[in-house]
Amino acid sequence: MKGYEVNFDGLVGPTHHYAGLSFGNEASTKNRNNLSNPKLAAKQGLLKMKALADMGMKQGVLAPHERPHVPMLRRLGFTGDDISVVAQAMRYSPELLSSLSSASPMWTANAATVSPSADSQDERVHFTAANLNNKFHRSIEAETTSQVLQAIFKNERHFVHHEALPQVALFGDEGAANHNRLGGDYAKRGVQVFVYGQQHLNNGLPGPKRYPARQTREASEAIARLHRLDEAHTVFVQQNPDVIDQGVFHNDVIAVSNQQVLFHHQHAFLNQDQAFAEIRQKMASIGEDFISIEVPENRVTVDDAVATYLFNSQILTRPDGGMTIVVPEESRQNAAVWSYLNDMIQMGTPIDAIQVYDLRESMRNGGGPACLRLRVALNETELNAVNPKVLMNDQLFMTLNQWVDKHYRDRLAQEDLADPHLLMESRMALDELTKILGLGSVYPFQK
């Protein structure tokens, strides 16, 4: 049976703003309090989705979350009707309101970890929503993420949904941003590579000193168990703590995979040779080669990789069998990065083409092409069981652009978050979106 990789991109929400909430993410911190353009951000994301669908890729849409998150504001002691709750939060704690108005669910690489049926002992696709407990503004996402995923992947014969891991540091989980799957055809068994930043139950191991390691080995191992993965085809690798301290807050800022290929920086992993030997051996056990494309420090520094999000790219297998790398405009603007990319596609590796997209609104908040998408490998039967209303086509692209034009503002500052009209505009937009995408009532305000 034929297999597909379906990319589910997050639609940017109406409250997209620059709050600098993500310590360890240098772009997020640098652009704090800049004016944002939610309408442009949403349209930039939609353009990328449509372009990839037009290339013959399977492309889906994940809905934004309800923001401001009034239920959490109430848990924190603000009272009255919803508009009063938001007004009080702005008066007494504007930083808290900003945090609970973040459009961060757009970065769906952090939404969940997904294991395809070919790798799972029960031959079903497994989803575990990420708890994202390292950052308060993201720790509230798991419940809505699970609701949205269950509305898209409903059929229990094919899909299993697990609760997020416990909300404690021991099980810090940032989802697919720290997870790679290597293999051949998407419908056949692969090797899953879980990347972690620290191991809580073994304090003797090295860890970062400047910025937090958001993913723990304990979380990755728990997900592998939940997803019923075979140890013989699962690898756990520690990310180099030195690059975390240089702003590599997720593994998808320093490495990206597709099928047999792992595209990565020279300094991406701790004990890299040992890790790659294990990956190579486990790939051989499923009859596949392992192709490492390593970018040396003397061609692209870690600082340039972080600034341009070279590795926060997508590697896509085209219908003709070749691979295209999708990079942000910032990669083209950097001479060293652009020179390397153009040399790489002449090296005889499977990656032989480059596509560039302007995702500046997301990039300024610290998220590139790979942050915006959740990869789901499906066979033909499973793809047919997916809610078809979320799959990108000409009609959906037109409908969503019209929806954005109708509901989104073209500028947003932090002080606008208390505007009662923004709360009502956002809810009206999301209520309409759930009908467009056939999601049902997934938001707290709809219940």
Swiss-Prot record:
Gene3D superfamilies: Succinylarginine dihydrolase. Signal peptide: none annotated. It is an enzyme of class 3 (hydrolase). SUPFAM superfamilies: Pentein. Catalyzes the hydrolysis of N(2)-succinylarginine into N(2)-succinylornithine, ammonia and CO(2). Homodimer. This is N-succinylarginine dihydrolase. It comes from Acinetobacter baumannii (strain ATCC 17978 / DSM 105126 / CIP 53.77 / LMG 1025 / NCDC KC755 / 5377). The lineage of its organism: Bacteria, Pseudomonadati, Pseudomonadota, Gammaproteobacteria, Moraxellales. The gene is astB.
